[in-house]
A protein has these predicted regions:
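Short helix-loop capping/hinge motifs at secondary-structure junctions, enriched
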Residues: 135-142, 174-182, 266-272
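Mature extracytoplasmic/periplasmic domains
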Residues: 258-318
Length: 340
């Protein structure tokens, strides 16, 4: 009941009898997320509000350029994407606008909101270190920095340096430690690889569990998806994987977020605001968590039992501007260090 009251309050005027023409009330979302769980959120929003959703899907950079090219005539109301740096890029491109919402502020922690109100996180994925429970956690593995220690020579499976998740992690590392330390760290990882980088995060987990190395670098999201796979072998394998949340004694574990922004030229700002607030409701957060195996962004939101069992962790606050600014240098340093 409370959720419906909050939603109605956030979209004041949308439900007045004079404008109850559902076919004319729409919100256009330009989304770089392509998940069935998102469709469930859209359907739940339409059912609760009567507002229809129009979706344009493409890569984040493509959508940013499209909105910029469309200019004042863009039909886009909301930009939705993965990665804080992409949200920062949209902001830098001048296609977003700040907005204030007491509802969002009360549900989403400050560290997951852009300080100027341009965007907020709707869900999270932690970039963690994984190991085979049967073999135990590798001794001394506590921080991302430890991956460069030569005691782990031939033990690491990780995606290529050009992968967006790794660029974001290295950008975060660069912000914390500087260029010299970042290059040395990347060189250490390259020297410690169990095999040349190949495949996605799930491939790193599978390779590690098959005996190729002892440490897999992966997002929790992928392990979570393996735990609910239709293939029993995948589900059983996921249960045998242990997780280390790095850097709990200092800056916290790096997280990738999915977030949303209100487009500067939104033709339906009231409807857009209603949807943005809906993303933070228990109903929507539950779909992110249970349907797509992501950590919810809202405080006190439900988390999938599999992810909950991994334990609490301190996270690094995602600074989209720093991640965006550091990305080119971070990639250059990784590649120069031999991390292919």
């Amino acid at each position: 009941m409370q959720r419906r009251i909050l939603l109605a309050g956030s979209a004041a005027g949308l439900f007045a009898p004079a404008v109850l023409r559902a076919q004319e009330r729409t919100v256009s979302i330009y989304s770089a997320r392509h998940y069935d769980s998102d469709k469930q959120i859209h359907e739940a929003f339409t059912q609760a509000s009567g507002i229809r959703i129009r979706i344009i899907e493409a890569g984040a950079d493509q959508l940013i350029e499209r909105i910029r090219a469309e200019g004042a005539n863009s039909p886009a109301d909301i930009f939705l994407t993965v990665d804080a740096s992409r949200l920062a890029r949209a902001m830098e491109a001048g296609i977003t606008q700040p907005y204030a919402s007491a509802v969002i502020d009360s549900r989403i922690p400050e560290g997951l909101r852009e300080p100027g109100g341009h965007w907020f996180a709707a869900s999270r994925r932690a970039r963690v270190l994984m190991y085979d429970k049967a073999k135990g956690a590798p001794a001394g593995l506590v921080r991302y920095e430890d991956l460069a220690n030569d005691r782990y020579k031939g033990q690491i499976t990780v995606r290529s340096s050009g992968n967006g998740y790794n660029v974001a992690l290295a950008s975060s590392f660069l912000a914390a430690n500087g260029a010299e330390a970042t290059e040395a760290w990347a060189r250490g990882i390259a020297a410690n690889l169990a095999r040349p980088p190949a495949g996605g995060d799930r491939d790193q987990i599978r390779a590690m569990m098959a005996g190729q190395g002892a440490i897999a670098v992966s997002n929790t999201y992928y392990l979570g998806l393996m735990s609910i796979s239709q293939q029993i072998e995948e589900r059983e394998l996921a249960q045998r994987v242990g997780v280390i949340f790095p850097n709990q004694g200092d800056r916290g574990t790096h997280v990738n977020i999915s977030g949303a922004a209100l487009v500067k030229t939104s033709p339906h700002p009231a409807e857009a605001r209603a949807f943005l607030e809906f993303l933070t409701t228990p109903a929507a957060q539950r779909i992110f968590a249970l349907g797509n195996m992501e950590f919810p962004a809202a405080t006190e939101a439900e988390t999938h039992p599999f992810l909950l069992a991994l334990g609490d962790f301190r996270q690094e606050s995602p600074d989209g501007q720093k991640l965006l600014a550091n990305a080119p240098e971070a990639l250059r340093l990784m590649q120069r260090a031999g991390w292919r």
